[in-house]
Each structure stands twice: as C-alpha cells, then as structure tokens.
C-alpha cells in the first residue's frame, strides 16, 4: 500500500457534520493545505458497499492517497465514513442513492462553511457508485461547482452487480452452477423492482 508519509504540507482534522434532512451526523477527515487560502474544496464520495472515509479495501486506502495528493496541490479535501459505517450515524443497509446524494451535499455545505475554503469552488469527486452520486448532487444543488467521476457506472446497475458477482463467487469457491443461478435471481429481482411503482 502506498500510504502518505509525513511531513504533510496540510492540516488534518477529524470532523463531524450533519445531514439535517436525515438527522444524522457524519464523521470524516478534513485536510486543508498550509497557507492562508481560501482554497478550492472537494468532497470525496465512495463506491458501493459500506465504505470508511479512506475507502479501505484489501489493505489499500485510495481515498487517503487521493486526499494527500489533492491537498499537496492546494485543494481542501473532505472524506467521510458512509452513513452507518465507522463513526458516522445512520443506517447503511436501508440507504438509497438519494440518501447518499444528501450526505454528499451535506459535505459540500460543511466545506463551504470553512474559513479557509473558497465557498464557490467546492465540488465532488465520486468513485464507482460515487460517480453516480456526484452528478445527482450537481443536478440537485447549484452549490456544487464541479464534479469528477472516477470509474462511474456506464451500464445499468444490474449488469454491474452480475459482472461483479461472478468473479467474487469464483474467488469464494462457489460452484459455477450456483454463480449462474445467483445471476439469474439477481436479474429476476431487478425485473420485479422495475415493475413496482
């Protein structure tokens, strides 16, 4: 893993901000470059599944690395634990894309309120499912100055789930017949969900 090493040319602060619409507190880490500012800001929005603020996966922490990279280049970065994960309140399992969009916008509002952040220069970088959340947030609020989508979905969600499920099933040692049945069940459930109002 390529974790950043000190000295850091930025401050690191553990923070909490509130999604007032949902009534939950979200916990994260704010990095602000050294200097007077104001600096442009960005909220990092994670991919699918319950993610911590560093988007930790298999010993890697891509959001920690990305926050370091951006803050070393003069950008304030807020990364946060998904609702119901780590130190954040709320419930992850029942959350929808709309809920995650509101969480991201709460992060944008929090950054805009920071003295050393340029309020009109706050955007969102979304990875994977976060690449779906970022444009939803930008459509919802003019406060979002820009978006960056990293490996955002370019195909229907069910196709992503099936494509991801097959190698995961193989890696877990599941028989191919079970993996194929799981794919059929996922597609059938997606079809049922489309029919429901």
Where are these regions (language model features)?
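N-terminal cap/lid segment of alpha/beta-hydrolase-fold proteins
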Residues: 1-37
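Short glycine-enriched nucleophile-adjacent loop
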Residues: 131-142
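Alpha/beta-hydrolase active-site loop
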Residues: 94-115
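Glycine-rich "HGGG/HGxG" loop immediately N-terminal to the catalytic nucleophile
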Residues: 78-80, 84-95
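Alpha/beta-hydrolase fold nucleophile elbow
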Residues: 116-128
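Short amphipathic alpha-helix adjacent to the substrate-entry channel of hydrolases
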Residues: 56-77
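Short beta-strand element of the alpha/beta-hydrolase
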Residues: 38-48
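Accessory cap/linker subdomain of secreted extracellular hydrolases
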Residues: 148-197
